[in-house]
Amino acid sequence: MPVSFLSLASQPQIIDYPAIKEEIDSIKKVAAGDPVSEYRAVSLVLKQTVLKGREVIAEALTRRPHQGRIAALSYAYLTDQIIQLALYAMVGDDEKATDNLVILAVGGYGRGEMALHSDVDIAFLSRRSPRKAQKKLIESLISLLWDVGLRVSQSHRSLSDMVKMAKKDITIRTALLESRYLVGDKALFEEASTRFIQKVVAGSGRDFVAAKLLEWDERHLARGDSRYLVEPHLKEGKGGLRDLQSLFWIAKYLYLEKEARHTVLTSPILTDYALVKADLIAGHEAKRFRRCENFLWAVRCHLHILVKRPEERLNFDVQRSLAEKMGYRSKSGKSAVERFMHHYFLVTKMVGNLAALFIDALKVNHYLKPKSRRSGASKQIDGFPVIQGEIVLDDDFFFRHNPAALITLFAVAYRHRLDIHPLTLRQAGRDARLIDEALQNNPVCNAAFLTLFTLPYNPAPILKIMNNTGVLGRFIPDFGRIVAQMQFDMYHHYTVDEHAIRALDILWQIENNKLEDLYPLGSRLFKQLNARLVLYMALFLHDIAKGREGSHSALGAEIALRLCPRFGLTAAETKLVAWLVKNHLLMSHTAFQRDLADAKTITDFANAVKSPERLRLLYLLTVADISAVGPHIWNSWKNQLLTSLYEACSQCLLEGPTGHGAGRQQRIENRQNDVSEKLDWDNDLFHALVKRLPDDYWFSERTDVIAANMQQIIDTDSKGQSISVRGHEMPAYDATMISLYAIDHPGFFYRISGAIHATGGNILDARIHTTRDGMAMDNLLVQNSQGGMIKSGEHLNRMMQAIEDAATSHIRSSNKLAALRPPLFWRGKAFHVEPLVFIDNQASDRFTVIEVNAQDRPALLHDLGCALFNARLTISSAHIATYGERAVDVFYVSDLFSHKITNQNRLKAIEKRLLAAADAARISEK
């Protein structure tokens, strides 16, 4: 009869063991000694049984989509029955066939936890080397199990080998820790269990704990040391299933060591029971363990069913479908997928809290080197008992007697550079519910909280601890709404709360010159600040309205106006914080999506900023905000653009709008003098070329770029050539500058961009100039498809040749570009960005500014350029910004007579063309 470790009402529906057994008996009779036909018939029956059982489990999960634990156990139960039936098909009821042989379920399968495509880990154990017949039986059984659709992973060891290998190899020891009897010699299993505990487990608890916690740290490091990565690894990521399993392994190991009379046989599934019995967590915490486990297993089971393969990563392309499968719906400004992932991150946060409590208990129980809670002399600091530099509460009702201490605890630790004992944090988390509206408005509590931003220490670590305990979200309910909240896009790598705290950490490092190489201007500006508190508070609050309907910047400013007086900021400070929150995207949008060489860009930005102090604050907030989005988001190109905008705006604020305009000609002359010194040419030659270049050119390019362009023009003209393409590496931008000098003609830009895209390049920025005698002098900043510099060599040469071909012979790149389809599993496919076109005739005095928001894809810029060409427009400059799956391409354009486009019908026609180009897989060249 089957061994059952699970009580399921749907067991007969999953698999009818007696009926299948009878069918196998019938097959044997019909086969009448024909082993081939018998094998085929049995394997077919078992395969159909597996498929039917899996369908039943999937249907049950669809009806009750959050019953993950039941689904995981059901898959294990089905697998048990199939293995036992397969063995029965081979040996019948002959117990001698498995004499001296036992089959064990090990690993996750042994624990009774499986998803649809989980490996089936089994171990064959014998007292001594098996007989020839048993070896053949093992081989045949494994073959049959594979044929019926089980992904079997197996090992075969003798009893003595099992003990030796378990002592040496922590992975084998962990797998055996979860051994569960399936079928065979039960006496052998009991003996093996006893020897495993007495010879391997006994006396090795400390070593096992240390090894597992080392694995824990290494795993988190490998997967990204944050539980809030927006494409998390369900199994191996921080706060995922492996973390829960690690807690269980340690608990079970220590429990077995402590209660050596118990064997693996007598406790086939311990889970939260083991955690409690090992005195590692309390009963109510074990319930949280169970809830987390149930949810994560539900996600894993749905994921395996959805993708039809063993997949553990919650990629963007499955998150939306998972949310639908698990019954989430859009609500209150949050999409269904954002609500699902919010729940996911809350669960991983809970796992992190459980882990912290668990590790603390290990210290208390001396399985890790503990900081004694009671050793050493105690002293009082601001009402808190402190032992050896650590706040250690000796009263379990401390916070209930004094709820305000829930806030002052963290302020005292921060001010006096004290640690907080894990058990004290545990109490704070438990009692966080005591924080009510009265406590939120308590002046003492708010003054204490404000010290986290006024003292010169890094506020990020203490805020992270407050957040992990739940105190921060209770004290500031608006912040509580963004805890574990994700944004369903490819740009933001972390949840909103994690992003805010990371941004504060980066800001503090900039202030303290720890990142001077990355942020040279930021480090200098901090020394000039008068409103440090305002900056830190604005950064803390800048995304606090994320996830609400409406502009999160405007709504966040309203929240800042309400919260800052409560915290103790003055009216002037509050007003400035609110302005920064409302405008926290202004500088990045201006720098990345507007032409910084256009005088009106600078004057409009300066009019919005109004003062040098505001400019400094906004620059520093912008830098920290961008850098905290995720790894590699901040780069030298963004640094250069923001620095250029800062310097230009600073100059404009210094001179005033009138002075800024009046000094334009003087700045042109200064730039020309700088270039002249760099080139050291004959004056007549230099000034002859200067006359050919338009005034805007001198504002658009840096001195070294202008010098290189002028040398390129002279070299080309002197050789009587009509075209020149040069490329040089720009390490400061992590990109390559392509400079093109050729006869200008309509459609020049889109053909050139097509050639770049067709040869594996992405354009970051394009400066498009036409000399007074009709030559194009264009500078394009280009990266490879991986977002890096295209280094000198075959790739760069091939790209420059393609550009030359496109410029001289009007070669169209449509055929090559048509082949640039996104990869089959392109992450951007999970998103839909509705294309939008904004046309602005106020942003520039000379050009119409067109902004296109669209889903990023290969050759998008080429398609948009083609649409503008077909609309008979001339592009003066193009500015390209990407935010994950979303591209924002901005063009400064004029008509063929160098005038703005003002006719409303024509503007509507242009918008229609661009929307079609942005939304189409490919557009045709007319």
Swiss-Prot record:
Enzyme Commission no: 2.7.7.59, 3.1.4.-
SMART domains, sorted: HDc (SM00471)
Protein name: Bifunctional uridylyltransferase/uridylyl-removing enzyme
Keyword Nucleotidyltransferase in record: yes
InterPro entries to which the protein is assigned, alphabetical: ACT-like_dom_sf, ACT_dom, HD/PDEase_dom, HD_domain, NT_sf, PII_UdlTrfase/GS_AdlTrfase, UTase/UR
Activity regulation summary: Uridylyltransferase (UTase) activity is inhibited by glutamine, while glutamine activates uridylyl-removing (UR) activity.
Protein origin, superkingdom: Bacteria
GO biological process, any: regulation of nitrogen utilization
SUPFAM superfamilies xref list: ACT-like, HD-domain/PDEase-like, Nucleotidyltransferase, Nucleotidyltransferase substrate binding subunit/domain
PANTHER family registered for this protein in UniProt: BIFUNCTIONAL URIDYLYLTRANSFERASE/URIDYLYL-REMOVING ENZYME, BIFUNCTIONAL URIDYLYLTRANSFERASE_URIDYLYL-REMOVING ENZYME
Family label: Belongs to the GlnD family.
GO molecular function per UniProt: [protein-PII] uridylyltransferase activity; phosphoric diester hydrolase activity
Region of interest (Uridylyltransferase), residue spans: 1-379
Region Uridylyl-removing: start-end pairs: 380-736
Keyword tags: Hydrolase, Magnesium, Multifunctional enzyme, Nucleotidyltransferase, Repeat, Transferase
Stretches assigned to coiled coil: none
Purpose: Modifies, by uridylylation and deuridylylation, the PII regulatory proteins (GlnB and homologs), in response to the nitrogen status of the cell that GlnD senses through the glutamine level. Under low glutamine levels, catalyzes the conversion of the PII proteins and UTP to PII-UMP and PPi, while under higher glutamine levels, GlnD hydrolyzes PII-UMP to PII and UMP (deuridylylation). Thus, controls uridylylation state and activity of the PII proteins, and plays an important role in the regulation of nitrogen assimilation and metabolism.
Cofactors that this protein relies on: Mg(2+)
UniProt domain comment: Has four distinct domains: an N-terminal nucleotidyltransferase (NT) domain responsible for UTase activity, a central HD domain that encodes UR activity, and two C-terminal ACT domains that seem to have a role in glutamine sensing.
Residues of the HD domain: 496-618
Catalyzed reactions per annotation: [protein-PII]-L-tyrosine + UTP = [protein-PII]-uridylyl-L-tyrosine + diphosphate; [protein-PII]-uridylyl-L-tyrosine + H2O = [protein-PII]-L-tyrosine + UMP + H(+)
